[in-house]
A protein has these predicted regions:
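Histidine/acidic residue-rich metal-binding segments in metalloenzymes
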Residues: 102, 143-192
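Short, acidic/polar
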Residues: 71-79, 139-152
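A short, structured active-site edge motif that brings together acidic residues
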Residues: 118-125
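The substrate-binding groove and active-site-proximal loops of carbohydrate-active enzymes
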Residues: 133-138
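Divalent metal-coordination and catalytic microenvironments
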Residues: 1, 15, 20, 40, ...
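Conserved beta-strand scaffold positions in the cores of enzyme catalytic domains, especially
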Residues: 33-37
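Metal-associated gating/positioning segment near the N- to mid-region
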Residues: 41-111, 127-130, 182, 186
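N-terminal metal-binding scaffold of metallo-dependent hydrolase/deaminase domains
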Residues: 1-31, 41-43
Length: 192
């Protein structure tokens, strides 16, 4: 077994795992009840995917017309695939059905397999702006507070503001601002 610590390969060649935790990393640790031969394999630190949307089909590259009837199962499968690929933490930066929150809570409770999820819920966007179909539209600070309130009520881990347009939403451009700097500053102050 090769062990990569994020900077270099280290001389240790054994990992002792108890339950879900790494108990020890060393050289030729004693063989326990269950040993797995990892010859030719490399262990790395868990990867972080900083921008996912578990609600979206990664193969479509377009906004959904309506939620898929099997969306919870599809999201669970996507989360499982992430873990199998070495992703141990992911930030879900937008959805409209709140199902990523249920999945996050099930993963945290040990009921589902998936990475640690940090969820933002409905991103704050301008009316008709990027990802408006997720329900986070706000044209002023009063409307932005309403979106923020929904996020807090759902225990959002972070708040996402669509400062510019994006490629997913027709008529929206990543180079065009959606909000004034003053409104963004107000939203950030309230979110803190």
């Amino acid at each position: 077994l090769k062990i990569w610590n994020g900077y270099r390969s280290i001389p240790e060649n054994s990992i002792d795992i108890e339950g879900k935790l790494i108990r020890n990393i060393g050289t030729d640790l004693p063989v326990t009840q269950e040993s797995i031969d990892c010859s030719g394999m490399t262990a790395i630190p868990g990867l972080i995917d900083a921008h996912v949307h578990l609600e979206l089909n990664p193969d479509d590259h377009k906004a959904p017309d309506k939620p898929h009837p099997n969306l919870p199962s599809l999201m669970e499968e996507r989360a499982k695939k992430m873990v199998m690929a070495g992703i141990t933490t992911a930030r879900d930066l937008g959805g409209g059905t709140w199902q990523e929150f249920s999945l996050r809570d099930s993963i945290n409770a040990g009921l589902k397999l998936g990475p640690r999820l940090l969820c933002s819920g409905q991103p704050i966007t301008s009316p008709g702006g990027h990802c408006h179909f997720w329900g986070g539209e706000a044209s002023n600070i009063t409307e932005a507070k309403q979106v923020l309130k929904r996020q807090v009520e759902r225990n959002a881990d972070l708040i996402k503001i669509m400062a510019t347009g994006g490629r997913l939403t027709k008529g929206s451009s990543p180079t065009n601002p959606q909000f004034s700097l003053e409104l963004i500053s107000e939203i950030v102050q309230i979110a803190h």
